[in-house]
Amino acid sequence: MLERIRDSFTESIQTKIDAAEALPESIEKAAEMMVQCLLGGNKILSCGNGGSAGDAQHFSAELLNRYEIERPPLPAIALSCDTSTITAIANDYSYDEIFSKQIFALGQPGDILLAISTSGNSGNIIKAMEAALSRDMTIVALTGKDGGAMAGLMSAGDVEIRVPSNVTARIQEVHLLVIHCLCDNIDRTLFPQDEQA
């Protein structure tokens, strides 16, 4: 068991090294898009399933509260938090529509959808992306593996941040780091006077 634990750390480190080579430009582009969205008076909606739902909530919490510097709250909504809404939609319609119906109600042109799926094939995330596109929103997708069906929905104005791994746990670990990079870039761009040395 000790060897398995050490292997998990080693694999996680290697995946992050690979991601450090592959992802910085797309992370920077996504952060710039988010900054422009927020400066334009818009908001960022986020969604995911399971651990990715936790990541969506984590991102939203960092924007609504703060990341590492003191600053005003920034508008973000995690679509995985309202159990009454989610269960009503799943019961009356379909689990695949739990995020898309919220996007049709809350999403506005100029908003961003942060869509998170390690496989890129989650049905409700695909529907969420389709809803966002119909609302003239921009999409930032956090994926892994081969990008799945989500990769095929991306337009030139969207950004896919695809973790170079086929292991769900490693993808999730890098997704969290990507989220922290996005939050850091947003904060440091919007509030440069608060930047620490």
Swiss-Prot record:
Reactions catalysed, as given in the entry: 2 D-sedoheptulose 7-phosphate = D-glycero-alpha-D-manno-heptose 7-phosphate + D-glycero-beta-D-manno-heptose 7-phosphate
Complex and partners: Homotetramer.
Family, as annotated: Belongs to the SIS family. GmhA subfamily.
Gene this chain is encoded by: gmhA
Molecular function (Gene Ontology), one example: D-sedoheptulose 7-phosphate isomerase activity
Ranges where the SIS domain occurs: 34-196
Gene Ontology CC: one annotated term: cytoplasm
Name of the protein in its database record: Phosphoheptose isomerase
Cofactor: binding details: Binds 1 zinc ion per subunit.
Binding-site residues for substrate, renumbered to this chain: N49, G50, G51, E62, N91, D92, S117, T118, S119, S122, Q172
